[in-house]
Amino acid sequence: MNRKKTQRRLSKWLLGAVLVSASVYTPITGGQAVAAKQSYKAMEAGINQVITSQRMRGTKSSIVVREADSNKIVYQYRADQGVTPASNVKVLTATTALEVLGEDYTFQTDVLASGPVKNGVLNGQLYLRGTGDPTLMERDLQQLAKEVRQSGIKSITGNIVADDTWFDTKRLSPGIYKSDETHYYAAQISALTLSPNEDYDAGTTIVQAKPTKNGKPAAVTLTPHTNIVKVVNRTRTVPKGKPNTVTMARQYGTNTIIVSGNIPVNSSGKRQWVTVSNPSAYTADVFKRALAKQGISFSKTTKVSRSKTPANAQLLATKKSISLYYLMMPFMKLSNNAHAEILAKSMGRAVYNEGSWDAGLRVMRETVQKDGISLKGIYLEDASGMSHKNKIPSEKISEVLFEAQTKPWYPTFERSLPVAGINDRMLGGTLRNRLTSPLVKGKVLAKTGSLNHTDALSGYVKTKSDEELIFSILTEGVKSTAKPDIDKMVQVMAAQ
């Protein structure tokens, strides 16, 4: 299995984050703590000025600023008010996963045979059993297929069976709208799923359209290729200089992706991540193709199906994922929703032997409570922040951020947070184009959050006087976006 490229990329995530943290953002802990300023009046006035501005009028906000070393609240505005946190929910998901599952946690994917093998023929089913690995890629399935061939199997009479029973069968959280379902951020959650590349957007396929000759349809491809998805190509190549109007969307309730619009000659075309309905079947189908490439043949009746693996099935091959220590980087830097929901179900499975949202969210609430944080004002419907019904007060998120500093896994959590103004997406993540002034660039580590009319930012900021503050800013009911206003507040904190 070729892991060198993956490991280099993961190492870049870690090394880059460490360098930024070491050279720009040095956390203040223990003996490094500097004396807190006696007065935060200037900061208070500055934040209040933003809150009362015309842009923020009518916005529901909850804001808390704490000293990172003492936990003393130095500013608060409706701190106990529950506000839709968007992806700031991931602060709870990430810290809980590190606490419950641990940094060394990995996902395992197995291939097992049920039935006798005689003269290279498996007279039975071949099972692909998953436990939620969001990093599983086509190349991993190719390696597993190679190991099946090396075990002596040359032909299979039964089905290629997807075993996704590690999780329940509920694929989408309640906060997902029908209009969201085609988009990568609303991928279906399954214990057996596949990512098209190293961004690890599990449950999606990359659809690419490239121009051909003028007047002809564009060339449309899927990565990875799968027979589960049907592509309807309604594109047309148009002369150079014409606008690119190509759209790509999966029809609701189907695995049909409609690609339509005009694509100019000599243009780069368009590439988009589109979700797949039934990720288990998608993964098993790509695995079946990998088996065929290894020269393994099938009977005329062999198909992709779904079932639980029998207890007496023979293990043929295993693939373990990268550890949570590594996964935290793409999860938090890129705010990956599928990772959040998979981790929630994994926590439910680990603690209550139930891979469901109910069990996973229960674990999250209980873990927060164990740190002495009240659940008052907290309501969770998912672990990614997609639901507008999620509610968390800023004081709770800031408490979680404070308690995280006391944990042995804190360096991993800290490295996973986007770094303000750092252009490399593997470092800056969702903050790479924000807070770019010298006052704050590289000095803010924070989780972003954004939904329609909802913006949030929670994390750590190094001030001008070398003090570290914890902050949580949650806003909803914004007419357009509160991001500029949130950034102004953080700059006010940094100037302290």
Label each region the model flagged.
Residues M1-A35:
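Sec-dependent N-terminal signal peptides of Gram-positive bacterial secreted proteins and lipoproteins
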Residues Y25-D69, Y75-Q81, Q142-S151:
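Beta-lactamase-like hydrolase cores
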Residues K41, A45-Q49, L92-E99, R139-Q142, ...:
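Solvent-exposed, polar/charged alpha-helical surfaces in well-ordered, non-transmembrane soluble domains
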Residues I51, Y105-W357, R362, E366-D371:
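Conserved serine DD-peptidase/penicillin-binding transpeptidase domain
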Residues T59, I156, H339, K376, ...:
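Loop/turn elements at helix/coil->beta-strand transitions in domains of secreted/extracellular proteins
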Residues N71, P85-E103, I160, L192, ...:
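Active-site SXXK
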Residues V74-Q76, M137, A344-Q496:
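Small-residue-rich helix-loop
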Residues R78-V83, W273, M386-S387:
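A short glycine/serine-rich beta->alpha loop
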